[in-house]
Amino acid sequence: MANSFINKKADLTTTDLTTLYTVPSFKTAVVKSLIVSEDAGSGSTITITLVNSSGAIFNLFKDKAIASKATTELLTNPLVMEESEVLKVQAADANELHVIASILEIQPREVVS
């Protein structure tokens, strides 16, 4: 199977921790872009974490400010994620933030003997 570009989107309507993306079995993922936009006009903050396959939590962005009516690209370099790792997002305020991740999913090559 070929590699594929996908995107994952979330309208953060609550302040709950929300799963944005989970790397499928037998794949590696490269997050190429992570865009957050604020549409309420008051500004907000977002926390983004990566959870590895053992359940350890790594903060990528903690209370990152997103300006009023602004769109912010959070990544300056691609983020590599391994099988079963999870990208989670959490808004400080409900109904203010949208998140879009652009992702390349990589399928390992099959070895034929």
Features from the language model and the residues they span:
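Tight coil/turn sites that cap or link beta-strands
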Residues: 26, 69, 83-84
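Short solvent-exposed strand-capping/beta-turn motif centered on an Asx-Ser/Thr pair
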Residues: 36-41, 92
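Exposed aromatic-hydrophobic patches
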Residues: 71-78
